[in-house]
């Protein structure tokens, strides 16, 4: 079966969504055609993150007709994990906010290692062989030890899981994904 893509259509939808987001928060890093990170550090003390997230969702749905999911967390890696749960688990109504250490710890304990951004099948197998099975397990390992035995990318991931923002993109608190199926 062969499907045709309409890149101009996707780009138009993406541009409209990114414009809405940039109106809500000028610090935006467009990661891909369907993902963006917003830097909410300047707003963190001034806004309610729950209201902000639902306002983003509502505006994008009302103005553009596209459903989105939002993950808010101290680092990009944590935000992507939060976003994945927001998208996949209907109990969260498309929004997951990881703002307290206790909540983050609980969240990481329930997250299988293969769900982490950048960890594929081969790396999952290697980590499971040394008894690292969850995001929490990985977050408890010394990041330098991981860097010495694996690579700098995984070392950064460990630091991000610990709440230390170190991905080369600007520090962000919100991760948004547009479900591809909603474009069709």
Label for each model-derived stretch:
Residues 40-43, 178, 184:
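Hydrophobic pocket-lining residues within nucleotide cofactor-binding pockets
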Residues 67, 110, 178-179:
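Proline-centered helix-kink/hinge sites
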Residues 43-44, 73-77, 103, 112-113, ...:
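Short acidic/polar capping segments at secondary-structure boundaries
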Residues 81, 107, 149:
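Residues that scaffold the ATP/ADP-binding catalytic core of kinase and kinase-like folds
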Residues 1-91, 143, 155, 163-170:
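Structure-specific DNA junction-binding interface
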Residues 93-110:
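A short, charged helix-loop
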Residues 2, 115, 123-176, 181-182:
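DNA-contacting surface of Y-family translesion DNA polymerases
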